[in-house]
C-alpha cells in the first residue's frame, strides 16, 4: 500500500525512541524500541480519533477509539508516554491481560510497562496459539460499519449479480490500485464502490475531477485504471474535499485501502485468493 509516512510507528518511531532514550537515561529510565504507494508528506491532522471533531459541520466522524471504562493506571501511563515522547498523538492506552499496556496511535499499536521504561513495537504473538494479537487488535480498532460509508460519494461498478460488495480508496496514479483492478477483471458477481482519493500528486486531483464529472464515471475510471486511456477533461463541482476529509477520518494513509461488508479493512492490493476469501 502507498501512504504518507506516519510519525507514530515504524522506522520514524524507532528513531524517535532512541533520541528520547538519551534524554530519559539521565533520569534513570531507558526507552527501547507496517504493499502500496506512499503519498508525499505527513497528513494534516484534521481528522479525529476521538469522535468529537468533524472535518466540517455535517460530516460523519468515524472513531478508532473503542469505548472503555475509566482506568487511572492507564491514564497515568498515557501521561508518562506523552512526557517521554513529545509530539506523538496518543489515541488511547489500555491495560492488557498479559501484563503490558497497549498504546494506540491512530491504528498503530505499541506496548509498554507501567512506568514507560521500555517500549516495544509489535507484532505481539500469542506463543500458545501462534495468533498475531497485534494484527487482530488493529483490525478490530480500524473496522468501520460498511453501511455507514457515504456510498453516494463513490464511483460504483457492478459485475455479474453484484452480490459481493467492497469499497476502495484509490488514487488514479497509484500503481498498486491498477494491480488491484487487474485482479478484479478476473472476478465476477461483485460491486466495487471507489472513493477517489487524490493524495499522490497534484495531477491526481485533476484526474479525479475529470473522472467524477464524466457522463459515465464508472466507464472512464475503468478505461483509465485498466486500459490507460486518460480521462477527457470535464468540469463540475467534484467533492474532492469530502473525499479527503473522509479518508482522514478513516485514517486512510495510502492507496488502495479496501473496506469489506464485514467491517474489516485491508491496506494494499490483495491477490485474488485472499480477496475472494474476504468477500
Swiss-Prot record:
Lineage: Bacteria, Pseudomonadati, Pseudomonadota, Betaproteobacteria, Burkholderiales
Chief location category: periplasm
GO cellular component, one term: periplasmic space
Native species: Bordetella parapertussis (strain 12822 / ATCC BAA-587 / NCTC 13253)
UniProt-listed CDD domains: DsbA_DsbC_DsbG
Region described as Disordered: 33-74
Cystine pairs: 174-177, 213-236
Name under which the protein is recorded: Probable thiol:disulfide interchange protein DsbC
Keywords: Disulfide bond, Periplasm, Redox-active center, Signal
Cited function: Required for disulfide bond formation in some periplasmic proteins. Acts by transferring its disulfide bond to other proteins and is reduced in the process.
Amino acid at each position: 500500500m502507498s501512504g504518507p509516512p506516519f510519525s507514530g510507528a515504524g522506522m520514524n518511531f524507532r528513531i524517535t525512541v532512541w533520541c528520547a532514550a538519551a534524554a530519559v537515561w539521565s533520569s534513570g529510565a531507558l526507552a527501547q524500541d507496517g504493499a502500496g504507494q506512499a503519498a508525499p508528506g505527513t497528513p494534516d491532522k484534521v481528522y479525529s480519533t476521538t469522535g468529537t471533531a468533524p472535518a466540517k459541520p455535517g460530516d460523519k466522524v468515524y472513531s478508532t477509539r473503542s469505548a472503555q471504562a475509566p482506568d487511572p493506571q492507564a491514564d497515568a501511563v498515557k501521561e508518562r508516554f506523552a512526557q517521554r515522547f513529545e509530539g506523538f498523538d496518543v489515541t488511547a492506552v489500555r491495560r492488557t491481560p498479559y501484563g503490558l499496556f497497549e498504546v494506540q496511535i491512530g491504528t498503530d499499536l505499541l506496548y509498554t510497562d507501567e512506568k514507560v521504561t521500555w517500549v516495544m513495537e509489535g507484532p505481539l504473538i500469542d506463543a500458545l496459539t501462534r495468533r498475531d494479537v497485534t494484527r487482530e487488535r488493529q483490525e478490530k480498532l480500524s473496522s468501520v460499519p460498511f453501511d455507514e460509508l457515504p456510498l453516494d460519494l463513490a464511483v460504483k461498478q457492478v459485475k455479474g449479480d453484484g452480490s459481493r460488495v467492497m469499497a476502495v480508496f484509490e488514487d488514479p496514479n497509484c500503481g498498486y490500485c491498477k494491480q488491484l483492478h487487474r485482479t478484479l477483471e478476473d472476478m465476477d458477481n461483485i460491486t466495487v464502490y471507489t472513493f477517489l482519493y487524490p493524495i499522490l500528486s497534484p495531477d491526481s486531483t485533476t484526474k479525479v475531477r475529470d473522472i467524477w464529472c464524466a457522463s459515465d464515471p464508472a466507464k472512464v475510471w475503468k478505461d483509465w485504471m485498466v486500459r490507460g486511456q486518460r480521462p477527457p477533461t470535464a468540469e463540475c463541482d467534484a467533492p474532492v474535499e469530502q473525499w479527503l476529509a473522509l479518508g482522514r477520518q478513516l485514517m486512510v494513509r495510502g492507496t488502495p485501502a479496501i473496506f469489506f461488508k464485514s467491517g474489516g479493512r485491508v491496506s494494499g492490493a490483495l491477490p485474488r485468493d485472499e480477496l475472494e476469501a474476504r468477500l
